[in-house]
Amino acid sequence: MKRLIAWLSDLRVAIVLLFLIALASAVGTAIPQGDAPRSYVEAYATRPWLGLLNGEQVLQLQLDHVYSSVWFLSLLAWLGLALILCSWRRQWPALQAARRWIDYSNPRQLSKLAIAESLPCTDSNSALQAFSTVLSQQGWRLERKDNRLAARKGTAGRVGPLLVHTGLILLMLGAVWGVLAGNRLERFLAPGRTLDLLSRDGDSQVSILLEAFQVDRDPAGRAEQFRSQLHLEENGNSLDREISVNHPLRHRGITIYQADWSLAAITLQIGRSPQLQLALRSFPELGEQVWGLVLPTRPDGSEPVFLSVENEQGPINIFDTDGTLLTLLRPGGPAVDVKGLPMRVNSVLPASGLLLKRDPGVPLVYLGFAVMLIGGGLSLIATRQLWAIASEGQLHVGGLCNRNLTAFSKELPSLLRQTALAHQQG
């Protein structure tokens, strides 16, 4: 059992686990996550991922939901256990040892330490008192006994690794909590439409109304930014906010992102008809961003034409059944004859693509990052220990340091010079 615990808490095992988790995260970034199973089968049917895995194998290995897969969560749990065992077996004893006063009573013991010096003096007890005063003035903690003393400084540096491990564990717990208990919803909303979010009991939790949606474009017509004007209603309280790409809205644990855009409907007139608002649908086989509809031009449904559009500014292309381009229409432009019927497009209605995420683990993740940063800062503090023994006209001093021993070896002679000066003046 002890050998198993020692193996689990080994630093090399933790490094391998971190590498595997990083590799899995890279795979989760490269492969789209959370899509319908059929889309993976179709996407990797002719071109396997990395030339190795087809769609069925991607699904079997749970690569379509890496971050919630059993094997990924097992890696996180294993790493968390390794950190806990490492803290228990190594870091906590190191902190206790740094806080424990060790009493060296023989100068020969000090000579075996990493740094050792001797200061000749006429009165060793007086020199010891001067050394004690110098250390106290520079923030050292002291314990004095008869003809000897022990001092330490920077014990907080031993707390740093424990805090780093604690922060990592909190971060992983927050990430797992978010994956298992969080929710994600993607919806396209046309202006004037409402999305109701329900609680687990089926009650309305919050109602989101899209009041307006705007696409900012450059002079060449390329989209630069998407903006949605949202109105939220919750228990009689209302909130109006604008969201855009990289500027989400956070409200009571729910984050609303401006994620995408689409075209929802086209408003047109055919002959003397009233304005007709007809829904558009995507045609990915014609292009990445192509929307359209099939419209009959005769009362019996015959002689249809196909209307296609790529953005809300137009133009609207009208094709015959054989694929011939008949004409172009522009929103707000004049009517154009299409197979004997005057047709006019009033407007094209864009839709806002909203991504709603509820991640209860986010506060825990932020707390974990904060604890890690504090621990990382404390870990930079060197833990130093000094012992001094007054004996027969000599002040024997020895010390230990867990990092930057070179700087400590330069500091000790400086402390002794200050001690000698204080001793002479005293």
From Swiss-Prot:
GO terms for biological process: cytochrome complex assembly. The chain crosses the membrane at residues 11-31, 69-89, 159-179. One of its GO terms (cellular component) is plasma membrane-derived thylakoid membrane. InterPro entries: Cyt_c_bgen_Ccs1/CcsB/ResB (IPR023494), ResB-like_domain (IPR007816). The keyword Transmembrane helix applies. It is found in: Cellular thylakoid membrane. It comes from the Bacteria. Pfam families: ResB. It is a multi-pass membrane protein. Keywords: Cytochrome c-type biogenesis, Membrane, Thylakoid, Transmembrane, Transmembrane helix. HAMAP family: CytC_Ccs1. Belongs to the Ccs1/CcsB family. Required during biogenesis of c-type cytochromes (cytochrome c6 and cytochrome f) at the step of heme attachment. May interact with CcsA. This is Cytochrome c biogenesis protein CcsB. The gene is ccsB.
